[in-house]
Amino acid sequence: MSQKIIDLVTAVVAPAIPDPYELVDIEYEKIGSDYILSVLIDKPGGITVEDTADLTEIISPLLDTIQPDPFPDQYMLEVSSPGLERPLKTKEALKNAVGQYINVSLYKAIDKIKIFQGDLLAFDGETLTIDYLDKTRHKTVEIPYQTVAKARLAVKL
């Protein structure tokens, strides 16, 4: 059900996001007794509180136009930045992340490892090449894109 809502909201909201903003992700989840619709937006240099207020004024009325109403319960709209650990949900997002430190979770393990964290050296649209630390040694792994369950930027400590 929530994926259907996300798909409907994405179809309505994505075309309305003006340049230079980028729709990064949409999440719909229940937190406690509240439903939260999170619309994650970014732009070069990051977004401000004023940006989120302006975008909320664009997005909120659009959500009211979706018929029939896809939301089974009342929800809170949250427009925000994706933060430091932004999700990398598209091939384009992964291409833009080359050279950055990322976290990748896999559907099935490679060499008994299901989560890799390291520098994304390359992404050709089909394979991610990551330099990661295995104990004290740097290793390189090639990960087929179709085996990626989730990817996001990560903070290197």
Curated annotation (Swiss-Prot):
Residue pairs linked by disulfide bridges in the UniProt entry: none
SUPFAM superfamilies, per the entry: YhbC-like, C-terminal domain, YhbC-like, N-terminal domain
Gene Ontology biological process terms in this record: ribosomal small subunit assembly; translation
Subcellular location, principal: cytoplasm
Location of this chain's protein in the cell: Cytoplasm
PANTHER family on file: RIBOSOME MATURATION FACTOR RIMP (PTHR33867:SF1)
Classification via HAMAP family: RimP
Free-text function comment from the UniProt entry: Required for maturation of 30S ribosomal subunits.
Protein family per UniProt: Belongs to the RimP family.
Protein name: Ribosome maturation factor RimP
Natural source organism: Streptococcus thermophilus (strain ATCC BAA-491 / LMD-9)
